[in-house]
Amino acid sequence: MLRLALLVLSSMLLAILPWRPQSAFASPPKQEMAFTSPQAILGWINQYRSRPEPMRLPLAVKAMSALGVFRDLDGSGVYIGFMAGVLGANPQKADRLITAMFPMPPEDQVAVVRGIAYSGLPDWRAVLQRFSERMPARAILIKRLIDGKLPTLEKLPLDTSPAALDTLWGYYFASGRKEPVDRIIDALQWATEGNSVDKLTAGSMAKWTLANNALQRKDLLDHLKAEKRRRPKAVADQLAEVIEAAETYETSQIRKRALAAIEDLKRKGPESARKMSYWGMAGQTALALGCVVAGAMGHVEIAVPCVVGGAASSAAIKMLTPQ
């Protein structure tokens, strides 16, 4: 009888209570940034360290593949570096994260291979070997990386490709580790280079991206100040200008002076210095455009990091080429 009475009472209460859909009682779901464009992915990368979400990496990597960012070899550095940084910062989850990135088109597997090789995981060679069966089309690349015939992140040359500089930035954005930043600081020795346009461009891009990213990140600015005290005078002087530009929000002066120096060397320097590779042209284009193309074209509300690749893409170069 007691059970019957309780059932009747419950039915009466349900009848007099106003009905609401279940969703009305549920807490609102967390808003997650959708990876609908390269700019949206860059926005997520930019704020990642304030809210790390390593388990979203596979979804982001699949979006990168679908959006075609890996196929722009010079523009994909920040994405590959970021992938490597997340894997390196989460060694216990690395296998699970990589597994969830598959299936992946063979042409985009190069990015996954490099992401693993650049991760800094203590056993990255073993990890790469484990996943080699899923990437038979990349067997030669995998073997050369494992055998040490291709450089890993800490040995990538900075004066031959914009991708190397961006890859270091991507790793830093994911992990907060200072080793990639220190390599970028090393390139400041070329900021006054008088014998190679490529090296002058690389040094200028290092200086420009350091200033713009330090402007957004206090921990990075503090690290640059600490490095200034221990670096040789030539690099310390460049760091002083970077710090001043970041603290006064006057980074445009670095860009203008760099462009003028490159043009001057091309015009007046010895013939050997005037020769400019694709990297030199792409880097100069990136300086001319600033971080705008790497940022959100038409989406200024999305904060993005300052990287070279977006502005060094073929589309950006076309924008500056007379039609």
Task: Please provide the spans of the model-predicted regions.
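Non-catalytic all-alpha helical scaffold/repeat segments
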Residues: 25-323
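Bacterial N-terminal signal peptides
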Residues: 7-18
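Positively charged n-region of N-terminal signal peptides that target proteins for export
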Residues: 1-4
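Signal peptide processing junction and immediate N-terminal pro/mature segment
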Residues: 16-28
